[in-house]
Every structure is written in C-alpha cells, then in structure tokens.
Amino acid sequence: QDNEDYPLIRTGPYWKKFKANFCEFIAVLVQQCQCSILYDSYLMDTIISLLTGLADSMVRAFRHTSTLAAMKLLTAVVSVHLNLDVNKHNAQRLYAVEKKRISGKRTNYRLEQLERKRKEYEHKLLEIQNMMNAIFKGTFLNRYRDVIPEIRATCIEEIASWIKTYPDAFLNDSYLKYIGWMLYDKQAEVRLKCLLGLQGIYSRKELVSRMDLFTSRFKDRIVSMPLDKDHEVAVQAMKLLMLMSQNCEDVLSAEDCETLYQFVYTAHRPLAVAAGEFLYKRLLSHEGDEEVQPKGGGKFGASTDQLKRLIRFFLESELHKHVAYLIDSLWDWAGKFLKDWECMTTLLLKNAEEDGEALNDAHESVLIEIILATVREAAEGHPPVGRGAAKKILSVKEKKIQLEDCNKITEHFIMVLPQLLAKYSTDAQKVANLLQIPQYYDLDVYSKGHPEKHLDALLREVKDIVAKHSDMSVLEASARTYYILCSEETAIYSQVDSARTQLIDELMGQLNQLLDGFWQKEEGFCTDAGEISRMHSALGRVAVFHNAHDLTKWNLYDKTLRLLVFEMEHGSLPVLMILPALQCTYFSLLWQLAAVSEHSPKETLFSLRRELRRFSQICMCFLHHKEKGVREKAFMILCDWLLILSHQDSNNNEEAAGLLDYLPNTSLQEKLHLFIQEHVFVEEEEESKDLTEEEERKDESCKLDDLHKKRSLLAAYCKLIVYNVVEMTAAAEIYKYYVKTYNDFGDIIKETLSRTRHNNKIQSAKTLILCLQQLFQTHVESQDSSSSVDFSSASFTNMKELARRFSLTFGWDQVKSRESVAMIHKEGIEFAFQRATGVDGKCLPPNLSFLLIISEFSNKLLKPDKRLVYAYLQRYVAEPLPCRGDEWQPLICYRNSLLA
C-alpha cells in the first residue's frame, strides 16, 4: 500500500529536522543504554522484533520508517561493538601484563578482576553480535532490494557507514557485494549512495589493500558510470575513479584512462572539472614519465614540460578540438602553470637552434589556442559558452584575482604580442587567434609608464596583416583590435585613431582605384578573374572594417549602391563582388540609422527613408537572384533589417517612426514565407553516387554546412514572428514541420512556440489550432470525396502525433497553460462542427473527425475546465445520439477524453 503522506517523505525544514532528530534519538538511546540495559535480553529484543516486523509491512510508511530506524540502530550498535572490542583488547593486554608480574602460584585480586572484566566484554560482544546479525538478516537483507528507492538508498548508505566504522568486521566481500550490486540500480539516488560510500572506503589507503576482489569485479561498472544520465552520479563516479587511481596501483588500464580523459570536453562543468583533476594528476603532473626533463632545464622547466604534455594530449584527442573546454576543465587544478604566459610566449619565440625546445607547426597552433583560452578564462572569470547556465557572480576575492590577471596579461602582451604577430604574420589561423588577445587588455595600463613604442609596433603589425590577408577571421580580428584600442576614454585614443584613419584611407584608395577601372572598362561587362579577385578582396576588407567602424565620411554607400543597382539592371556581376557590396551597403545604412536622433533635420530623415526603401527593394529583388548565395544573403539582411527597424520604431521616436511606413506589408510577408518554404523545408533530391571515403567526408561536410545555413535562415524568420514583425499566424506554416524536421529544426520551432506563447497565450493557441486545421483540410482534400476520413492513413496519424507533441510543449503546469488549452478546445470544437446542417444529429458534420486530433489536448485540461468544455460541446450535439455508427466514433472518443 502506497501512503505518500508520512513524516519521512514530507518536504520542508521542519520535516527534515524531524528526520534528523529521529535518527539522533536512536543513536542516543543506544549510547545511554550501552552500560547495562542494552544487555537485559528484553529492550533490544523487543525493539528489534518490532522493527523487523514493521519492515516487512505492506504499508509503505511503516516499512520505510522502521527500516530507517533499524539501519540507524545497527549503526549505533556497530559503534558500541567497536568500543567493546577496544576495551576487550585493553583488558587482555592488562591481564597479560599483570600475570607476568605475579610469581609462583599466588592468587591476585587484580588478576581475577581483569579476568572477570575480559569475560564480561566477551559476553557483551556475543550479545551485540547476535543483535547485529538479527538486524542485518531480518531487515537489511529484505529491504536493500525494496521497491521504494528511498529505502534502498538508506540501506546502502548505512552499510557503507558500517564498513568505514568497523572495517575488521564488515570490510569483506560478504558485505561489499551489496554495494557492488546496487551500482546497477535503476534509481540515481541509490547509485549515488553507492558511489559516496565507496569514496569513503577508497580514500583510506589502509583499507584499499583489502578491496582487491571487489575492485576486480566492479571496476568496469565504475569506469562506465561517468556516462550516467544523472549528472551528480557521473561527477561522483569520476571522483571515485580519481581516488582509485591514486590509492590502487595499476587498477586502471591505459584504455580506461584514455576514456576518462575525454570527459574534460563534456558540456556539464562539474563532471568536466572532476575529469580535469583526473587528467592533471594522472598525466600532466606525473613525474615518472620519459621526456619529462627538458633538455635546457632553465627557468621554465616544469611549466614547459606540462605544456608539452598538454599539447600532446590535445593533438592525440581525435574526437574533440575544443581548447576552451579543455582549459576550463583544468583551470581549478592547473591554474598556476596555465597562467604562466611568460613561459608560453618564450616557448613560441625560441628558435630550434638555441636549445632544441622549439615546437613544430601543429604544436605552435595548439599553444596559441591555449594562450588565447587561458587569457579569456582569466580575464572573464566564467566558463566558455555552452558550459554553465549563466555567468557566475564573482566574490570580492575572485574579482581581485581577475583584475590582477588582467593587469598581468596586459603588461606582458603589450611587449610580446607585436613580436608574435611579426613571427606568424603569414599564418592566418595563428594571427586570427593572437589578434583576439587585445580585447582582454586593461587599457589603463597604457597610461602608466611609456608603452608608445610597443603600441606603435602593434599597430604597425596589424596594418601589415590587413594588407597581407583576405581571410575573414583575420580581418574581423584586426577590425576588432582597432575597435578595442579606439576607446575614447583612454590616453591612446588619438594615436590609434590616427593609425586607423591612415589604414582606412589606404583601403578606400585601393577600392576607388579598382572601381574606377571597373566602370571605365566597358561599364563592368568585361572583367577578368584577376580583377574580380582583387575587387572581392578590397570590398571584403572594407566591409569587415565598416562593420566595426563608421566609415560614413568616406562616402562608401554611393559606390556600393551603384554596383547593386547595376546588378539589378544587368545581372552580370560575379557573386564575389555582389556579396561584399551588399554587406557594405547594409552597414552604411545601419551607421546612418544609428546616427538618427530626435534633433535630426527633416531633410536627413526624408533622405534616409528614401534610401531605406531603395535598399529594401534591392534585397527583395535579390530574393529571386540566380545565385543561391545572393538569395540567402539578401534574405538574412532583410530579416535583420526588419527587426532593427521595428525595434527603432518601438523607441517611440516620432520622427524615426516614419522610416517604417513600408514595413511589413502582406506581399513582403508572403515573399519571406515562400522563401523559407523553398530554401529550408523543400528537400533536395539526392543522387546515388559511388563515392570514395574522402569524397564522402567532403559530401558530409557540405551537408552540415547546408544544414547550418538552413537553420540560420529559419531562425532569422522565426525572430520576425517572435517580435511581431510578421503576423503570428505565419508561424502555422512553420509548425507543420515540427515533427517531420525535428532533428534538424525542432529546437528552433519549439523556441518559437515558447516565445510566442509567452507574448500572447490566446493568439499562440489560435496559431497552433490553425496549423492543425490547415493540415486536416489538406488531408480531407487529398481523399476521395465520397469516402469518409481514413483514421489509419499516414497523414492522419502524423496529424495526431503532431497534436500530441504540441500538447507536450505545455508542460506539467496546467494552471499556467489553462487559457491556451481551453482556447484550442473551443476553436477545435467550432471547426469540427463547421458547415453542420442543423443540430439534430441527423447529418454528420464534415470535420467531425477533427475531434480526434484535439482529444490529444484533453489531458492538459483542469477538471473544472473539462466540464466547461464538455458543456460547450453539448451545444453542438443532440442527446441522445440518433446514430451510433463508426462515423460518430470521433465524437464518442472526444467526449470520453473530457469525462476521464
């Protein structure tokens, strides 16, 4: 019998204290009775009999309470047994000493007294042993497999306590096996108690030597437990393995360790940190390995060795390439050597001729990534994206350490970064990573001392890098570096601003020269591949810098707009020119829009509004461009554009509000929706080809890139729905694909559903039911008009499944979703009885089977609401039903779901 209302399972501080006091009472009772009453053959026999009987009860409350009492009683008795055992050994030693002192056959009162004491202890120990056996066999053996997980957990927790308290009696396979068996328990709570108990045992070296049999039997199970679906169990399993690794020689094989090392990349931070401790203590700080001593020794010997171990480990981890995750996992254990940036940069700048410590290219790339990850972790003070729910609030001490680290980073890299950039200036990946370091600078350091020469060196290197590279990641990092250093509040602003202006003058000069040649040469109709490449590079550089810096005074807008208009009229420009030109024009308008204020002249606003309209028309035109890349870029820009302007309008700026006159009309909404249908949800036909392994990898990579683009397009469109730029009813077309495309887009559609519901519960519910109604109508139209709806058809089954999945999105809080679910039923009933001729029940409503669809939402109704919905249904139904054939089955099923 399940009685779910008794003290031990009630929540709250009062009942928690009650349980603690109950357990303490049992311990105190035994302690107070241990001198005499405990052995009167009445009290304990009575209590043990009572608890054993109640522990076999069918009533859960009795069984749980008596099992807890019996286990705590045995724990207390074990302590008494331990004390008696100590006293007995002391008495025996005293007896032996006293006996040696007596000569001849003389009797001694003291000797007789000790002998009586020793026998008394033996008698008491026998009594206690009988009590322990009675409780263990009568309660533990029956209850450690109880159906209630709390009871099983109590048994395992206490047996672990007995083993730790009195290992001489309990530390053997006869008792350990129960903990081992329960490692396989279905409930995480029980598995957790097993692991915590084992941690207490494996943490004591004197006990580990007696665990050999248990370790050999259950090691594989423990090694697999960091994969446990319960996070806390996984973390404690990793901590247990750490203890086993430290205290049991060679218990973990190389394969076991390799498996466990990979958990440093897991998204769950506590598990990753536990794995980081395992990796650090087992691999990085291990002293007995070969190649540990660097050839040159010197100042950074220990740190250099650890860094090389870390780099080798990362390169050998074929499954993962996430340096930031690896560093975050090790941060709590290896913070000292991970903050040794002087060692890291010295290792990079050394030449192989000096002492043989130089790294190869792959090692250098990883070390630069490690430097960036450690700098970010030290400066930001929180885990990387995807690990940890939110940024943690730093304590005063942590904040102080963070500021000291930022200062240390700035002082060191101000001098070293220009040298590193000079050394690796031709390597795009290395340079892109190195250029991200200045964003973590404490710029106030520049005002102390005289770092002008270092700043000049940095700006000179960045300028050379921009000239050398066309890689987007390098250019973006360069533009961001200028943006970070160009903070107007700092002492270096004028110096950096001057360098930035000089660089952009040169970039614009190159672009203007190319554009002049382009227009003069038969107005752009004849362009060779070299010119296209140069134009692409020039436009790309300017676009990247325009993203981070306002280039309005260079009059870039007119130049790029002319290219877009030319493409609209003639359609002959290559994609490599169109995409950066489109991006430049977009950024130009964004900077102009950002400059609009309440005091802007009307002429400026009218001019800007005209340009906004022209650009939006260009983007809408490019939605039908022959090149897929141009279509997708135009769509993304248009979505962002609409979102930004809608936000601008929400700021209640009356002048700026005029910018929104054209947004978003029905025609534009239809175009956007049609674009999503064609580019996201329409499946491309795959040709069956015989591909080599290399070609298969490339094909798979292309598919992933294509999926990423589709997700970006869908997310951009869904944002418009969420922020009411596009009508919420447009989401109905998206929701239709929720189940069909769940693996690819399910998270985006679900988030859209959640956000729209948060904005407007009623309208969101109407959109859901509209989606199902449209699918139902399509299903009906696809069937033979003379036949009734086929409930077994694939399309109808898919509709029911979609409705069920929609129902699951409401969660368990029926009160919170009350209005939405009620609206779904109301709209569904009205649709089901649409075009019904009369209410006498003689004519079957054409949409009656739709009731089967909305019955999936019945379990989300509160009981009072079920009665209301049932009453609303009765308005459309005559009682009793004159016809009870199969055609009326949907109505009967729906009514039953409401009456359940």
How should these model regions be labeled?
Residues Y261-K308, P580, F587, A730-H758, ...:
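Eukaryotic acidic, Ser/Thr-rich intrinsically disordered low-complexity regions
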Residues Q1-C35, Y39-N142, L283-V416:
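Alpha-helical repeat/alpha-solenoid scaffolds of the HEAT/ARM/MIF4G superfamily
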Residues E316-V323, D328-I371, V375-H382, L434-Q439, ...:
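Extended alpha-helical scaffolding regions
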Residues A76-V80, Q92-S103, Y184-D185, Y265-L271, ...:
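Eukaryote-specific, cytoplasm-facing alpha-helical/coiled-coil scaffolding segments in long proteins
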Residues K205-V208, H469-M508, W519-W554, V575, ...:
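Charge-patterned, phosphorylation-rich low-complexity C-terminal interaction regions
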